[in-house]
């Protein structure tokens, strides 16, 4: 695959793209789950770990300092399984998200090609539009699962939600349908530029990197890592705002950070964070996010390419006369 001049978006049927995308999301999610829990807890921490003055209103909130210390503390106080809190809704989200994302990406790309005909737009622009559209559709469709993942990961020793079914019932009763979509504006505002930049960068880098003789065909993985790091850094403040909006509601003061402020709206939340935490507050958890994004994207893209290739080979073998 790496040495092929074909683009990912031109290969396979819709069903094959969906299967490959779902498989890639499932595997990637399990691998990076502990880093995801750490990232969420750092993002929700509105007090500075290094500024004692910000500790005056902790209300029993925990203080996390860095990736490894946070992992150790979670393991020590909550057990090994705590590093996979929220993994059930997260697995469902990643499988669904990846399948919808790749399928929509391919469909939009083919639609653009049919629309413009001979006057085909540049590959980078095509990838940006298709990636942004795929991200927006997938984010909206799977957002309730994303919110549940965040709330489960934010739980400490005290269990607010005992199961996935109980959490859905509790939110529906106490917050209504809108409760499942808190922070959606930040989610879509984040994912559209992220996926556009990611796919445009990935498609640009994949072919030239694929011509290099790299071990285990890792040109795809390298392109995925670079594309992810570039895109993730640019839109990280929206990711943090989304997380803080997701834990708003009647359970806001019961998570590991019991002093989470009341937020309302994307830009008002951004303004509140800048005023009270400075611009650095918008980038809490960025380091672990990049550590997480790199292996997650590498595993996702590498697995997607390989699974799709296996499906194409299997289809060809089925069509070949025996």
Curated annotation (Swiss-Prot):
It holds the Pfam family Mito_carr. Keywords: Membrane, Mitochondrion, Mitochondrion inner membrane, Repeat, Transmembrane, Transmembrane helix, Transport. The chain crosses the membrane at residues 18-38, 92-108, 128-148, 180-200, 221-241, 285-302. GO terms for molecular function: thiamine transmembrane transporter activity. It is found in: Mitochondrion inner membrane. The keyword Transmembrane applies. PROSITE patterns: SOLCAR. PANTHER family: MITOCHONDRIAL BASIC AMINO ACIDS TRANSPORTER-RELATED, MITOCHONDRIAL CARRIER PROTEIN. Mitochondrial transporter that mediates uptake of thiamine pyrophosphate (ThPP) into mitochondria. This is Mitochondrial thiamine pyrophosphate carrier 1.
């Amino acid at each position: 695959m790496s040495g092929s001049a074909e683009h990912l978006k031109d290969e396979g049927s819709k069903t094959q793209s969906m299967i490959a995308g779902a498989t890639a999301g499932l595997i990637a999610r399990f691998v990076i789950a502990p880093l995801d829990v750490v990232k969420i807890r750092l993002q929700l921490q509105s007090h500075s770990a290094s500024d004692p003055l910000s500790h005056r209103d902790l209300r029993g909130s925990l203080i996390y300092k860095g990736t490894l210390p946070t992992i150790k503390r979670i393991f020590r106080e909550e057990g090994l399984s705590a590093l996979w809190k929220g993994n059930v809704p997260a697995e469902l989200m990643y499988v669904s998200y990846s399948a919808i994302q790749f399928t929509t990406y391919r469909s939009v790309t083919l639609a653009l090609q049919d629309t413009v005909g001979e006057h085909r737009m540049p590959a980078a622009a095509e990838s940006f539009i298709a990636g942004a559209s795929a991200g927006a559709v997938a984010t909206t469709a799977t957002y309730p699962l994303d919110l549940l993942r965040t709330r489960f990961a934010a739980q400490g020793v005290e269990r607010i939600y005992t199961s996935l079914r109980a959490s859905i019932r509790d939110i529906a009763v106490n917050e209504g349908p809108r409760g499942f979509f808190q922070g959606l504006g930040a989610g879509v505002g984040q994912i559209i530029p992220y996926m556009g930049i990611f796919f445009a960068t990935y498609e640009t880098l994949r072919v030239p990197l694929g011509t290099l003789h790299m071990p285990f065909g890792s040109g795809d993985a390298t392109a995925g890592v670079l594309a992810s790091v570039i895109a993730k850094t640019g839109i990280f403040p929206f990711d943090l705002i989304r997380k803080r909006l997701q834990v708003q509601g009647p359970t806001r003061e019961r998570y590991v950070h019991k002093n989470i402020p009341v937020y309302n709206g994307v830009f008002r939340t951004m303004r509140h964070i800048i005023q009270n935490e400075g611009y650095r507050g918008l980038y809490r958890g960025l380091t672990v996010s990049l550590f997480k994004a790199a292996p997650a994207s590498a595993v996702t893209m590498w697995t997607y390419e390989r699974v799709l290739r296996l499906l194409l080979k299997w289809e060809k073998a089925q069509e070949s006369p025996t």
